[in-house]
């Protein structure tokens, strides 16, 4: 993809200001068309590129902003208030960049790639799903083939979010043909290294702009593109924490925009009858409290993660992230926020009424409702709850 070279990447405060402007001036303006046409939010992603937002997780010494998990969550939450699909693309991109930034620094290839990502503002996608694993991202069927410093990797993915629009794709696979399904590696496949053949469609209820059909991936490249750490460590220390936190942040952002629309409606009702409190003001206050609770939840978990200094260089911290306590914390965050977001949007709809139900109304909440319904399905809450149930059987003290 031909993208402009970005010379100077702003730091977090400037990135947050830019993201808020993009959410309002670009993402929100195109959100309805992105949703209706189930098309990639190209205008928003291009605006994020121009503002240097895509390299936010990259360390400052490599030219990035060095944003921590809480700061990345704030960026995703801000964008989600304009367009949920755009925010999901940004969140998934950040997850993959973080995997490289936190687990690839001992490799000269990945250090150079991160510098290039900062300069070119590359967009990264991932393929962690696979036909035959039934949604278990911690198991792979496909295996890496190596020889003469090169690799070959082919994979049948059930979903590949915005892969057709990405500059590179992070792909999970078995270490080799003799490895167990859970003995996985993560490989960075650049767009020029692969061919993608779409195998399914993407005509969904919500999150339509993520463009996530199934793909057949055929790729080859240098062994240097294989992350040096096993995927089990990458998942526990980075992919799971970043996924559940950034997703929760953007679900909050979608719900926040729904509450803002409800608040605008209630203020309009109040102006019609000066000196009186409209009956919709009370449920709005209750809804605001629910929204605040969700925000406090994801921000508190992000702050706790950042506070332990969980870098791949800190053995004690990384061991903590492999423990039952942190696993339960991530599971609780994901389930709680994914269930609360659509409930909050539903509450906003009850306040606004038919104007929220109509698609051509400035108070329309249909897209918000449909987008948040995806939250409990992307990594099924039932699967996560079953994992938590098993862990609670052996946990002596609640985290």
Model-derived segments and their meaning:
Residues 17, 253, 285-292, 331, ...:
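Generic structural signal for well-ordered, non-transmembrane alpha-helical segments
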Residues 158-163, 243-247, 378-379:
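Glycine-rich phosphate/pyrophosphate-binding beta-alpha loops
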Residues 202-292:
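Glycine-rich beta->alpha junctions and the first turn(s) of the following alpha-helix
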């Amino acid at each position: 993809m031909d993208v402009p070279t970005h010379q100077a990447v702003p730091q977090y405060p400037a990135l947050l200001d830019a993201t808020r402007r993009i959410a309002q001036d670009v993402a929100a303006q195109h959100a309805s068309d992105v949703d209706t046409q189930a098309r990639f939010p190209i205008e928003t992603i291009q605006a994020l590129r121009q503002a240097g937002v895509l390299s936010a997780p990259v360390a400052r010494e490599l030219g990035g902003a060095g944003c921590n998990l809480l700061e990345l969550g704030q960026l995703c939450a801000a964008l989600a208030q304009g367009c949920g699909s755009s925010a999901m693309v940004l969140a998934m991109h950040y997850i993959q960049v973080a995997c490289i930034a936190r687990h690839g620094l001992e490799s000269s290839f990945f250090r150079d790639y991160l510098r290039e990502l900062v300069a070119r503002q590359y967009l990264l996608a991932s393929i962690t799903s696979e036909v035959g694993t039934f949604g278990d991202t911690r198991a792979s069927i496909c295996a890496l083939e190596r020889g003469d410093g090169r690799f070959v990797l082919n994979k049948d993915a059930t979903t590949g979010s915005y892969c057709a629009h990405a500059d590179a794709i992070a792909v999970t696979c078995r270490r080799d043909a003799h490895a167990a399904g859970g003995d996985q590696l993560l490989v960075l496949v650049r767009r020029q290294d692969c061919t993608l053949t779409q195998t399914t469609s993407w005509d969904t209820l919500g999150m339509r702009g993520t463009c996530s059909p199934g793909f057949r991936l055929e790729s080859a490249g240098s062994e240097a593109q294989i992350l040096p750490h096993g995927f089990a460590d990458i998942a526990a220390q980075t992919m799971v924490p970043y996924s559940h936190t950034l997703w929760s942040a953007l679900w909050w952002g979608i719900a926040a925009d729904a509450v803002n629309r409800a608040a605008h409606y209630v203020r309009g009702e109040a102006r019609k009858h000066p000196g009186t409190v409209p009956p919709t003001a009370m449920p709005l206050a209750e809804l605001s409290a629910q929204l605040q609770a969700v925000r406090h939840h994801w921000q508190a978990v992000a702050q706790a993660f950042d506070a332990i200094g969980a870098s791949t260089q800190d053995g004690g911290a990384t061991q903590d992230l492999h423990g039952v306590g942190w696993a339960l914390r991530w599971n609780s965050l994901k389930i709680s926020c994914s269930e609360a977001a659509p409930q909050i949007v539903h509450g906003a709809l009850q306040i606004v009424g038919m104007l929220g139900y109509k698609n051509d109304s400035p108070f329309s909440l249909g897209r918000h409702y449909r987008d948040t319904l995806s939250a409990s399905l992307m990594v099924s809450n039932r699967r996560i709850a079953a994992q938590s149930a098993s862990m609670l059987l052996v946990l002596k003290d609640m985290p």
